[in-house]
Amino acid sequence: MQETLQNYIPEQAIEGVLQLLANENVIVKIKQERKTRHGDYKKLPSGKHQITINSNLNQYRFLITLIHEIAHLKAYKNYGRFIKPHGVEWKRTFQHLMLPYIHPSIFTDDLLPLLANHFKNPKASSDTDIKLALALKQFDAPNGKTYIFEVPLGSRFKMYNGREFKKGGKRVKRYECVEIDTGKVYLFNPNAEVDLLD
C-alpha cells in the first residue's frame, strides 16, 4: 500500500497514514473520477471496510479526503453504525485524525491557515468551504473550466452532465441559475466548475 499511496499524498504524510490504516481490516481503492464525490467509505458484507478515493485529486485534496474516509471508519468502529454520517462523532474523529497533518512539512503556507479554520468545524465536504476549495484547486491540473463566480450575469453555461443553465443573481453565498430546458431554478456554489457557452 505504501508504494501506491506515495504517488498520491505528500511524502511526509505517508508514515502517519500507514499507521492509521495498520491493524484495520480495510481495503483502499483508487478509482476513476466520480463527479459527485471525492471518496467514500463503506463496511462490506464480509466484515472488511472499504475506502475509495478518486485518482484525479491533487496530493493535498487526496490526503484530506483519505483522512475524511478513515474518520468514517474509526467513528463507525468507536461509536457504532447508528451515528450520523457527518455528525458530532465523525467531526471529532476527523479533527483528531487531521490535526497532526496540519503542518508546514505537509501543506503549503497558504493552505495552513485555511485548513486550521476549516477544521474548527469540518463539513461533510471541503468543497462547501469556498476559500479552502479554491485554494486547493490551484494545485489541480488545468482543465479549461470556468468557476460560476467568473461567469458573467445572464451568460449560459454547461455542466459536466450536459445540462445547460443561465446564470442569475447571487443569493447570500450561492448563485441562482435557471436550467434552459426546464426553467427550474438551481443554486450553485461559487466554486462549481462549468463550461462557458457564450
Residue ranges and their predicted role:
Residues 3-6, 11-44, 50, 56, ...:
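Metalloprotease/metallohydrolase-associated module, dominated by Zn2+-dependent proteases
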